[in-house]
Each structure stands twice: as structure tokens, then as C-alpha cells.
Amino acid sequence: MTGTTPLPSSSLSVEQVNRIASNQEQNPFDILGPHPYEHEGQAGWVIRAYLPEAQEAAVICPALRREFAMHPVHHPHFFETWVPEETLEIYQLRITEGERERIIYDPYAFRSPLLTDYDIHLFAEGNHHRIYEKLGAHPCELENVAGVNFAVWAPSARNVSILGDFNSWDGRKHQMARRSNGIWELFIPELTVGAAYKYEIKNYDGHIYEKSDPYGFQQEVRPKTASIVADLDRYTWGDADWLERRRHQEPLRQPISVYEVHLGSWMHASSDAIATDAQGKPLPPVPVADLKPGARFLTYRELADRLIPYVLDLGYSHIELLPIAEHPFDGSWGYQVTGYYAATSRYGSPEDFMYFVDRCHQNGIGVILDWVPGHFPKDGHGLAFFDGTHLYEHADSRQGEHREWGTLVFNYGRHEVRNFLAANALFWFDKYHIDGIRVDAVASMLYLDYNRKEGEWIPNEYGGRENIEAADFLRQVNHLIFSYFPGALSIAEESTSWPMVSWPTYVGGLGFNLKWNMGWMHDMLDYFSMDPWFRQFHQNNVTFSIWYAFSENFMLALSHDEVVHGKSNLIGKMPGDEWQKFANLRCLLGYMFTHPGKKTLFMGMEFGQWAEWNVWGDLEWHLLQYEPHQGLKQFVKDLNHLYRNAPALYSEDCNQAGFEWIDCSDNRHSIVSFIRRAHESDRFLVVVCNFTPQPHAHYRIGVPVAGFYREIFNSDARSYGGSNMGNLGGKWTDEWSCHNRPYSLDLCLPPLTTLVLELASGPESLSEAANSPL
């Protein structure tokens, strides 16, 4: 060992050493690590290290094959030595801690930050679209040494350190360096994927906050809250063909039928069945005290094996997942997010979720995520009061808090906060290949007085209640999504009359390409919950939606929100005895799938679950042993098949040219009839809905073209549990004008039924019609 003689006097003051020892130095690189230092006329380097648990330390220079003892300076755990070399290569530290000896690389020897000044500039502007590749924890190599680079935005912090198993959760050991714009950064050599970590943030009042990483790619399973180092670039994707096709698609011309799912309550596995990872190794059980005894969550990989074939068989085009970003409380359904960049660990690893999405794409199923940029919870390890100040939220509770939900509101006027959220939306498309987002609670973002009484909100700069900053943010997000990912979906859950929600940003719209039609949903559920006799007085509930159907690009959704909190499940809302309940539901769904607009159904509705949705349970799968439930499931399957194979039902969903009434005025019989037309085609369908239990043996409607109209769908079919009334495969027109049309059909209308008829185009179609069972 050489270099054992200490420097005659250190260049450091006691104050500098104490700042390091007390974790008060904002740039530890100014003190720790290697520094050029001439000693007795010879060029060299002074190397300093603060090692809180070490009794002895030495510097190992592998290139020189030499070792230099370090000596305490002003503090028993602050060590220093001098190395007589003009050029110093990366060195190691030999540390003696009691009876244990370790050799490590010095984090403060690595001075090549991952973040560039340009990265920081873009972030400060709010325009770094891939900031998730810079902030957070990223496995990388510096100076040919593998490790993890950490970076976090905490501008009001006095000091920030990294905590983890690798340093005994001691914030003194890995103190981060402050960069411009309040970003803190440090590379920890030899750290690997899977390490748990947090940030220890100290403010100027001396308060210490332990926070999970806002940009962390993985978190521990709750109730633990640490982030986990993850590498999202290791998975090998197999969906290139899907992504290429999506890029060239025009979503509004496509059939979009969405199955809305909460992964934790769709189906459970027996707790005796051991879940495994990609290599077949057993996974530790996820603690869920509120699940039924003997049950556990399915993993992402198990869901790929069970959910995807189920959805594929039913004919849905997309799966929409209730939020899978990390959240601490199961009962929030995922809508109170703490880890915006982390797929929840309840069901497996990031690679497991990638596998799930990949399998969906390989089976022709798109994936939509519920995204929650409107608010976030107050959990101490999350974004709230992140650096000891209101960093992500507004300081004034009149702007920064949703009291009804007990959550905080993002400050959309702050560039870095907008960047955090906008990049997060792009992140899910980029890293997880998702196909769309549904933005939750858009109305709560757009209105400053949302669920607030007078005096509980602050007007905008013009004295109005519109949240101008939030609207601008949504325009920015949607513009970026469609710029980077053509063919993607961005869907708004917006419950007010805010104009042009689904119009392009270049004409002043918010830029979504679809909006949930909340008005249609409320009108339909009100209407179908009535005794059918009273429906004649409420025909407007059925017809009103067409008046505004083309003012936005609408999606018709019967979602999770309608089957909780005492509202009953969908089948339970229907009046009458069991037969009528199922017939009503089939009629409702038939009208829904023939009405203009894309479609969304929540899980369990497809087979008539009686119980309300329970996030702690799973679906009532045992009901499928009974014929009415089997029939309803078959009905939904056939309805999806009809919808996806009939361009007239989807290609002009957002255009008046795709719809025309035949008759919407037959209030007395509660019957409506209309035509759906295909894009740039003469093909059309005739739809007739009878909303009462009263059948009609002879009901005449006008049609525009003479010929044989084949009955291609009848919700009263015996296979669905209906009475099997119908039109024996179809009807020829009569030269009898009706409803201002030159020809008409004399139809048999079954009770509580949706009928769909198609003009036969040739002898083959006529033959098919003749062989139809109805």
C-alpha cells in the first residue's frame, strides 16, 4: 500500500466537512470525489469520501495497481487522500466497516450527467416530450461502469438524497447534486434493476420527506411505497404489424366496441394456485385482506391467458382498463394515482404488463387505459407537498383541492407539471404500446367551480369559471398524442356542454377524437328503468340524442359508474319479471349498437350480472350455468359480430349522412325506426325498436328501395332467451308509400325487441334469407 502519508493540511474547512456530514451541501461534487491538487510541486488528485459507517478506507487505482490509504479529516467518517497522477481513471474505495470489508466505486467520481443542459431547458419550458427517459431511475453505463442514474425535480428542497436497501436507507450516503431548475441528480455505480429506493427530501425548515419517485417505472406492492429500479427496454415486442396497421387507420371510420375491465375484480384465482413470473419462478402472494377467503388476483400473464380469449370470443375490438398506474388504495379503483409512470405491481412486473398488451395486439385487440390527470391523492409518499412546498398542486385550496374527493388538483399553469403529465400520456403509448387513453373527469379539470360553492373557487383572469390553463393543457396533450401516434384514441369523459371537446385543436377544439355521450346514457337508463306503459310519455328520451349526435364524435358508454353506489347492475335496472328484464336489456343493447357512436360496456353486463360491481370480489361467473345468462352472452357476441361486420353501423358514426329517421314519432306504441348508411356506399340497414312488451303482427314502415329485406338480427331470437317471433327470414316490400317513402315493409315486431334488416343484394343473399330460422 502506498500513499499512506496524509496531506499536511486539508484544503477543506470544518464548515465544508460539516455540511456534508449534516447533509446540507447542495453540490457534494464540490467537496467529495476527485479534485486536481498539487502537493509539494507534484500534480495529482485529492480524493475525498464521506463514509458514515467506515472506520478505515483506501483508494484503489486499478490502472496503477496501487492502493492509497485515506485519513479522517475534521470528522471521524470523512476521509481524504492524495494520488500523485496527472490523469486519474475511475477508481474504487476499499471500506472497512467493523468486521466487514467492501470494495465499491465512488459515486462522486462520475461527473458525466445523463441530463444535458438542453434537457433541463426543454423541461423548464414544458416541452420535453421524453422527459421520462431522463428523470427517474435509469440503468446505464458511465465510464464503462454499469449503474443507475437518478434524477428528480425538487426546486424548493435544501437537500435531496437517495435511500435504499443498498445504503441501509441512510440519506447521508448518497447525497444528490443540484442542477439548474431545481433538478437533483446522482449516478450510483453497480446498482442494478430491482433495487428499492426513495428520495429523502429536506426543506429549509429542516423537515424531511421520504418520497417515491414521480417518474419511477415500478413500485413495491402496497402497503409498501418504495420505487423499484426497472428497465423498460428489455422486453421483445411482437406487435409490429399491429402498430403499423394502426398508424394508417382512421379511428372514426372503424368499429370500436370496448370491453371495460377492472383487472383486480374481473376474475380471481385460487390462492392455492401459485402465480409465476416469465421464467416460471413462483411470485410472492399479493396481500389483499378484503378478498374472499382463498382468492387472489390474477397476474398480467394469467389475465392474458384468460381475459384475451374471452374478449376475443365475444367480438370486442378493444379492452379498456380501469387505471393500472400505481395507486395505494384498492378501493379507489385506481383513480387516486401516486405512481403515474408505474404499472401497478398488484398483478406483476412491467414486463408482465407489456406481455399482456403484446398478446392483445397479436390477437387483434386494442388496449385503452383510463388516465387520471385531473387530481391526485394526499398520501405522504406521493406527489403532495413533494419538496416541502405545493410543487405539483396549487397552494390555494380554492384552486388546489377537490374536497368532495379528498384529492389535490394539478397546477396546469406550471410548465414542469404540464410536462410531467403530457409526457406521461406519451409514455404509455411509447413504452407499453397502448392504443388509447380515456381521460377521467375532464369536467372537473375544465371548470374552476366544479363541485364548489360560492367563495370556494377563484375566477380566471377574465372573471369566468373556465380553467383556461387546463383546457390549454388538454389541447397540448391531444396534439402530441396524434402527432407521435397516428391512429391512436383519446377519449374524454366530459359530462357538461363544453363546446368542441372532440374537435381538432386547429379549429379551437380540445382535440380529443371521442367523447363519452353522458346525456345518451342518462336518458337511456331513465327510459329503460320505467314501466313500459309509461314510456309512451317519454319518447323524447330515446330520440333527443340524435339532435346532437353529430355535434361531437361520441362514444356510447354503459360504464362502471352506473353499477355502483346503490345504482344496481344493468339487468337490475330493468322493469318487469325476469323474462322482461332480459328482454329489456337486449332491446337496450340492440338500440345502443345501432345508434350512432362507438360503444363501451363494463364487464359483467355481457351476461347479466345481478349484483353491483364490487371491487373486492369478482364477477358472478356461476350465473353462466343458467340459460337466460347464457342467452344474453350469446346475444352480445352476435351483436358485436353484427356491428363489426356492418360498415353502416360504424363508418359514418360521426356524420349526419350515416343516419336518418324513418319514424321517431310513434309515441303511442313506443316504437322507433331508422336507417343507418355506410360511408361512400349505397349499402344501408333498417333498424326497428319496439320498447314495449306488446308485439305487433303487422307494423308498417317506409323504406327507400324496393326488394327483399333480410332480417339479419332479432334480439327476440330463441337462442337469446326470447319468444322467437320474427319475419321468417325477411320481407318483400309493398308498393305502398309510408313515412314519405315510396315503398314499405309489413313487419312482425316481437316484444321488447331490436330488429335489423338489410336489403338483399343478390340471389345468394335471398337464398340465405330463405334459410333463416326466423
From Swiss-Prot:
Cellular component terms per the entry's GO annotation: cytosol
NCBIfam families for this protein: branching_enzym, PRK05402.1, PRK12313.1
Chemical reaction(s) catalysed: Transfers a segment of a (1->4)-alpha-D-glucan chain to a primary hydroxy group in a similar glucan chain
EC number: 2.4.1.18
InterPro entries assigned to the protein according to its UniProt record, in alphabetical order: A-amylase/branching_C (IPR006048), Branching_enzy (IPR037439), GlgB (IPR006407), GlgB_N (IPR054169), GlgB_N_E_set_prok (IPR044143), Glyco_hydro_13_cat_dom (IPR006047), Glyco_hydro_13_N (IPR004193), Glyco_hydro_b (IPR013780)
Family per record: Belongs to the glycosyl hydrolase 13 family. GlgB subfamily.
Pfam families: Alpha-amylase, Alpha-amylase_C, CBM_48, GlgB_N
Thermal behaviour (record text): Optimum temperature is about 35 degrees Celsius.
Protein name: 1,4-alpha-glucan branching enzyme GlgB
